[in-house]
């Protein structure tokens, strides 16, 4: 059933064979090969114009090849056990096929994460197969270990400006550099950027002087250049190069130190009112920015100059933008998701939500699958090639949707007012791990006045 989806070459333990080491598999393999050869040798009614021939001497497999065949498992459970146990087996996975299979066959189960008194998770990224990092409205940078089920706090970085009023609005963006060498997010002052080294999460630098209001979006252009967008309607270009940074002396205790940097360039985004989200179009070498007044703005990534702005059609409460390599932008707004042609910014399709009052809070592309986080505590999946929501293989009458748990609202007395309307959290962020078989989703109460959180791993 899973042949072609996952492949695990298991190492034999002394004195034992893996469970997949069954001698009859060799005979079954030979029988299939013989049947395929006979089918190819069958003379068609009409002669072929182009014929290929195989070397008959290549039919026999060496003992080493036969041993590898017997040690190879195509079972999904063997793959998952090997991955979660950290075994040295050679593993491969067809991520496009696998992610669709586990979604359409209702195989994902939620593990809710207890965060305590934390207010709203706004951004997240997987660091590895076992660690996911996320930022909150209360300016916490947290790392969750999936295996240990433990949450650790990473210290936020403060700037060098004494007696300078700080902007406190939370961490709204986390981005990893293309080589996964650096992590960029907001600093303790929400109008500054903070960069950490991966995988250790040691501090590298704080970027100050680029913005006057909290940073809402970021995107890496390459391993050195980072762009940030803020509610002050500005975009800033930063260079992250440790060879050009000055690090203070850590003193006798050798405390971790970090540099202070300033932007290479700061641009006021014309016709914009509050930058909400950014993404980088690698194919066209352009930066797309989304503003809360319903415009999409395009910057040339090589010159860092604004080239155009376009008003989005009937777009309210637009908060997220994602780019697909086929030349598509996806913009999430109050009642639907818009697909735009990246060349012309013309609307290709409006994807209406399957549920009424379902505001779009987060969007992302993984392959040809558009994942949408909603204000009703659900994740929806849209196949851009098929032009429809992903359909369940278990129940053909419904589409695939992951319905998240309620999470927590503080104080708990506040929950009483939501019992009649069946309170659910808004999903502000989601991200897949490298195999796309595990999905982190998080958020919190939709009303700004409420304090609470939700976080969970679907696996």
From Swiss-Prot:
Disruption phenotype: Embryonic lethality. WD repeats lie at residues 166-206, 210-248, 270-309. It holds the Pfam family Beta-prop_DCAF12. Keywords: Cell projection, Cytoplasm, Nucleus, Repeat, Synapse, Ubl conjugation pathway, WD repeat. Pathway: Protein modification; protein ubiquitination. GO terms for biological process: autophagic cell death; evoked neurotransmitter secretion; positive regulation of hippo signaling; proteasome-mediated ubiquitin-dependent protein catabolic process; protein polyubiquitination. PROSITE patterns: WD_REPEATS_2, WD_REPEATS_REGION. Residues 25-67 are annotated as: Disordered. Residues 31-44 have a biased composition (Basic residues). The keyword Ion transport does not apply. The keyword Flavoprotein does not apply. SMART domains: WD40 (SM00320). It is found in: Cytoplasm; Nucleus; Presynapse. One of its GO terms (cellular component) is nucleus. Its main location: cytoplasm. In larvae, expressed in neurons, glia and muscles. Substrate-recognition component of a DCX (DDB1-CUL4-X-box) E3 ubiquitin-protein ligase complex, which mediates ubiquitination of target proteins, leading to their degradation. Required for synaptic function and plasticity at larval neuromuscular junctions (NMJs) by promoting neurotransmitter release. The DCX(DCAF12) complex catalyzes ubiquitination and degradation of yorkie (yki), thereby regulating the Hippo/SWH (Sav/Wts/Hpo) signaling pathway. Acts as a regulator of tissue growth during development: required for the apoptotic elimination of supernumerary cells during metamorphosis. Substrate-recognition component of a DCX (DDB1-CUL4-X-box) protein ligase complex. This is DDB1- and CUL4-associated factor 12 homolog. It comes from Drosophila melanogaster (Fruit fly).
